Structures are given as structure tokens and as C-alpha cells.
């Protein structure tokens, strides 16, 4: 998921994954119950917010969601996406991201995080 190049961050930045760029593609037997969990990243995130780091001491807060309205956080355990009966052999799941606004200017740099996807069936 790429939030792009930003010169300021005075308002939230919303993005959505695409096939080959952040979407989760699952191939499974139809009718199987599955759960797709996302961990909170390597920079000390939580169900409230995740963090991207520039490799130094600067971080930017963001979150990942299951829906375009950004109402349902996509996380682990009870915040995982549950599918009671997998509908077809292959499904693509979009990940919706929000980079939260900051007061002032964040430190210059490339900010990254690594989020692990766990599929349980």
C-alpha cells in the first residue's frame, strides 16, 4: 500500500490497494470458512493505530481497514476478516488505508512498515 509522496500532512490521506499492489488474493475451496488477519506491523502498532517509521526516531500513524468507509479496522483475532463460506475459487480482498494527519511537518524521509497477513482455514 503506497500513500504516495506528500509535501504536508494537514489532513488524512486515504488509499486503497489494487491487485498486485497490496490487495490480498486468496484461492480456496468454495464453502470453506476462512479468516484473514493482519498483524499490527513492526513499529509498535495496535488496534488503535499502526506506525510507519523513517528508520530513525520519526513515525507516522496510519491504519488499515476492511471497508471503504474505514469503519472496520483490519487486525488480528476479533478484528480479522471472517468469511463463513468462501464464495468461489479465487477472491481478491481490498485493503483500505488511512494515513492520519499530523500537526506540523513530519521529518523528511521514506516511511515504511511491514504487516504480516495470516490466512486461517
Task: List the model feature ranges, each with a label.
Residues 61-63, 112-113:
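Residue-level signal for functionally critical sites in structured catalytic/ligand-binding pockets
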Residues 53, 62-64, 74:
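Glycine-rich, pocket-lining loop/helix-strand segments that form or immediately flank
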Residues 57-59:
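Amphipathic alpha-helical hairpins/coiled-coils and adjacent low-complexity
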Residues 39-41, 63-67:
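Predominantly extracellular/luminal cell-surface or secreted proteins
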Amino acid at each position: 500500500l503506497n500513500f504516495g509522496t506528500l509535501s504536508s500532512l494537514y489532513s488524512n490521506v486515504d488509499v486503497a490497494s489494487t491487485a498486485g499492489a497490496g490487495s490480498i488474493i486468496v484461492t480456496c475451496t468454495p464453502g470453506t470458512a476462512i479468516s484473514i488477519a493482519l498483524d499490527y506491523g513492526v513499529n509498535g502498532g495496535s488496534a488503535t493505530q499502526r506506525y510507519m517509521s523513517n528508520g530513525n526516531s520519526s513515525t507516522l500513524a496510519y491504519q488499515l481497514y476492511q471497508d471503504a468507509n474505514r469503519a472496520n479496522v483490519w487486525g488480528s483475532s476479533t478484528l480479522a476478516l471472517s468469511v463463513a463460506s468462501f464464495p468461489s475459487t479465487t477472491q481478491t480482498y481490498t485493503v483500505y488505508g488511512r494515513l492520519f494527519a499530523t500537526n506540523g511537518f513530519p521529518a523528511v524521509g521514506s516511511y515504511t512498515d511491514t504487516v504480516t497477513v495470516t490466512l486461517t482455514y
